[in-house]
Amino acid sequence: MQPTGNQIQQNQQQQQQLIMRVPKQEVSVSGAARRYVQQAPPNRPPRQNHQNGAIGGKKSSVTIQEVPNNAYLETLNKSGNNKVDDDKLPVFLIKLWNIVEDPNLQSIVHWDDSGASFHISDPYLFGRNVLPHFFKHNNMNSMVRQLNMYGFRKMTPLSQGGLTRTESDQDHLEFSHPCFVQGRPELLSQIKRKQSARTVEDKQVNEQTQQNLEVVMAEMRAMREKAKNMEDKMNKLTKENRDMWTQMGSMRQQHARQQQYFKKLLHFLVSVMQPGLSKRVAKRGVLEIDFCAANGTAGPNSKRARMNSEEGPYKDVCDLLESLQRETQEPFSRRFTNNEGPLISEVTDEFGNSPVGRGSAQDLFGDTFGAQSSRYSDGGATSSREQSPHPIISQPQSNSAGAHGANEQKPDDMYMGSGPLTHENIHRGISALKRDYQGASPASGGPSTSSSAPSGAGAGARMAQKRAAPYKNATRQMAQPQQDYSGGFVNNYSGFMPSDPSMIPYQPSHQYLQPHQKLMAIEDQHHPTTSTSSTNADPHQNLYSPTLGLSPSFDRQLSQELQEYFTGTDTSLESFRDLVSNHNWDDFGNNVPLDDDEEGSEDPLRQLALENAPETSNYDGAEDLLFDNEQQYPENGFDVPDPNYLPLADEEIFPHSPALRTPSPSDPNLV
């Protein structure tokens, strides 16, 4: 059946609509952009020719099919055996390649014979019929501008060149690009769109900024890391500093305690070793701990020899330190023999008394003291020293007991130490004797041997001021009538004397003219007939102090404490020996301040204090005013009516240290 004219006309209109159809860019499901490629025209009848599109008597038809990008690339790769990178191909170049390669548009646009350029034969038809199918506009000037942006150059034939404008621009256009070549679609990836100078500059600036930002970020990361490390180090240093200060505080406390220990030890050793403090009194070792056996044999733990002042302080201190170090290193079990402990006695003793003189005490004393000393014997039952932890004090007796007819029995072995000087030791007996205010003794029938001495000027008077202060209460009795003080009789003494120094009456001023009388002389008379004749004799030469004995338990405790103390300071004994040996001990004590120079301080020259003497608090406020005003002394409720009152010398009212002696068989006073 032959198609009618209407059918032919309808087919032509459909083909025309198909040719003039404007394709739309769609996005597939996978997100890939679709491009349009030229397809081969379908088979048509011979009479179905496109009349309007025919130029120069040639007619053709073009069908455009929308295909995915991958299919287009495969088509290009199969045709040219070359691979093209789809991601780098602009859409404009792909559409331009499809337009030039379309065989149906050869009458409008086609390749040059050389294949290096393409020609647009009819720009009017190209902008009217071709551009709307591939682009969204039909502006030929916009197409030319796009070609210039991608580097295409307009080619002008030499035959038509010249300064005058011709009509060839409207009739014919030719463009070329080194990478837009016929049959070489792989070169399309090398065609790049031109960028403006501002865009290039902005891009360079952005790149430089990005590089700088990366550098800054790297530096910031490094700085953060360094800051973290510094913070860790600071925390560590802070902790170490805190620990160091804590250790320093503990070391300071320990150092302060050690300084206190060594100051006490140095003060004690200096006071013991210094021979210039007193010409009559010396001090023996550190607490005179004598390990004596009851049988009298001298062992390795026997008591140390008494210090000799002629050997010098250097040798004494060195010997003392060596002995202390040796005793602390000695085993504790070897220190006590025969189940006995140390004998602790007063460290004050007189020069020249040898330990040999302490051997036989029964040559000097009677049976009573020998019986008391029997507790130190080796044999027999358990003594009282072993039963009681408290020290046992043996009461001494005067050596004048032989004058009253007492039997003198000498013990075989007896250690006599010098104890503290007290009124109980001086005035032995049940009660005190009587003595009038003038110093006369009823037993002797005459004045006592006490004498007065004029008060010294300068430092002597000032030193006597403190000494005389305990006896200022005696001035109350000056204006009162003479009276006696009751007291008991002591068999060891043949005279009367008060039991309290505060009860000594004030001596009138006319007695100060007697040079050989002393105000307070404690008489130890051997015979009543010779008591008044021996005025220059030492009143304390035949006195002695009790011996203090300790129980073994207390001895062990004391020895253990001493051992622990000296063991803790053993490492510093060598340095302490060097310190003591380098000191000039000859000048020590020369600049000792007087008592009244430092108010409230103890007298460094006062060796012993009487137990029954008035306390310092009773006369502390009045002793400074006692000798300043010669008229009246209204202080603490008493007055001195005598304006001629003068202070007594220091040795008259209270000696520096009463002469305490341990009797020896060779003493001529014991005969």
UniProtKB/Swiss-Prot annotation:
Coiled coil: 206-240
Tissue expression remark: Expressed in intestinal cells, body wall muscle cells, and hypodermal cells, as well as many neurons in the head and tail.
Span list, region Disordered: 1-61, 329-423, 437-493, 526-552, 612-671
Low complexity composition bias: residue spans: 1-17, 38-52, 439-456
Organism this protein belongs to: Caenorhabditis elegans
UniProt protein name: Heat shock transcription factor hsf-1
Superkingdom field: Eukaryota
Quaternary assembly: Forms homodimers and homotrimers. Component of the DHIC (ddl-1-containing hsf-1 inhibitory complex), which contains at least ddl-1, ddl-2, hsb-1 and hsf-1. Within the complex, interacts with ddl-1. Formation of the DHIC may be dependent upon the Insulin/IGF-1-like signaling (IIS) mediated pathway.
Compartments (UniProt record): Nucleus; Cytoplasm
Its job: Functions as a stress-inducible and DNA-binding transcription factor, playing a central role in the transcriptional activation of the heat shock response (HSR), leading to the expression of a large class of molecular chaperones, heat shock proteins (HSPs), that protect cells from cellular insult damage. Upon exposure to heat and other stress stimuli, activates gene transcription through binding to site-specific heat shock elements (HSEs) present in the promoter regions of target genes, such as the HSPs. Binds to inverted 5'-NGAAN-3' pentamer DNA sequences in HSEs.
The entry's keywords: Coiled coil, Cytoplasm, DNA-binding, Nucleus, Phosphoprotein, Stress response, Transcription, Transcription regulation, Ubl conjugation
Mod. after translation: Phosphorylated. Sumoylated. Sumoylation may inhibit transcriptional activity in response to heat shock.
Any one GO MF annotation of this record: promoter-specific chromatin binding
Record region (DNA-binding domain): 89-196
Cellular component GO terms, alphabetical: chromatin; cytoplasm; nuclear body; nuclear stress granule; nucleus; WASH complex
Family in the record: Belongs to the HSF family.
Gene inactivation effect: RNAi-mediated knockdown increases susceptibility to Gram-negative bacterium P.aeruginosa in wild-type and in a daf-2 mutant background. Abolishes both median and maximum lifespan extension caused by starvation. Fails to prevent paralysis due to proteotoxicity under starvation conditions. Prevents the heat shock-induced increase in lgg-1/Atg8 punctae in body-wall muscles, nerve ring neurons and proximal intestinal cells. Accelerates death upon exposure to the Gram-negative bacterium P.aeruginosa PA14.
One record GO biological process: positive regulation of macroautophagy
Inducers of expression: Induced by heat shock.
Compositional bias of kind Polar residues: 370-386, 474-493, 528-552
